[in-house]
Structures are given as C-alpha cells and as structure tokens.
C-alpha cells in the first residue's frame, strides 16, 4: 500500500494542472532513503504507509537483536495491527517503529503546512487505527518542525470516514465535481 493525499480548498478537491496535485506520498522524506515504487528514493510513502511501517519494524527488530514479541511473524501476516498490538504490549522495536514513523510524517506535514497553511489535516488508513501510538509522535514532530507563527494552529486528527466507504465516496466526489 502507498500513501495518498488530497487537498481540499473551499470544499473542492485541488487537481492542479494535470489532476495530480497533492502527491504528499512522493515528497522526499529521507534523502537517499528507501527505494520507492515510483523510482525515487526516500519518498514519504516508503516510511509512513502500512508497508513502510512494516519495513521500519523489521529494521527495529534487527537493531534490537530480535527482541520483539512479533519478530517471528511471517512477512505475509505482519501488518500494522500486529505491530500496534506488539507496541501496546511493551515491545521496544514496535514502539520505536511508531516513534520513527511519527517523526518522519510529522516533519513532512510541517513542510506541507509551511506552504499551504491548512486549518486541518485528516489522517486515514490502517496505520492511523493505532491512534495515539502514531498520532502523538506525529503531532509532536509536526509542531516541533513548524515555524512559531504556525504552531498550535493546525488540527491533526484521524478521519471518521468508514474505511469501507472511502474509495466509493472519493470516486463519487470526482464524478459529481465533473457534472
């Protein structure tokens, strides 16, 4: 999975010149970082998506010499929920994973705020279901990396949109806007 984003201004989706405005998943989050499916290195989605979180977790398991409650979970069964449960159970590798992910995501959100100054940012998807494990370090990093004039002014919150409705509602909104 990747990391999608959209920018809503005055209730309308910002499309840009060719319909691809708001590709936050492909901003450079880590110089010379992980290879992304788009061909670039260090894209935000290689760190802040469900797959990125899995990769960070495996790096943390290696760093902490396999001292993890989920270290033996097969890659095909490893997901954000398994890592979340491990973090809540006190797993140091899983907790570090959320801290690192939140730091990177928060820094990129701060950059986005600097050039767009939104009133709110809504996060959505599997990793966001972990709640404060991801939201607290993300918010802390975002605020730390903001210029003082922007601090404590942008709401960062999980979307309340049901996961099962997201794709159809997004597609419907695009059709309605074209009518």
Annotate each PLM feature.
Residues 4-8:
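Short beta-strand scaffold segments in enzyme catalytic cores
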Residues 13, 31-35, 40-179:
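ATP-binding/phosphotransfer module of carbohydrate and carboxylate kinases, centering on a glycine-rich
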Residues 1-2, 20, 126:
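A short acidic Gly-Thr/Ser loop motif
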Residues 20-32:
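A short, polar/charged loop-to-alpha-helix boundary motif
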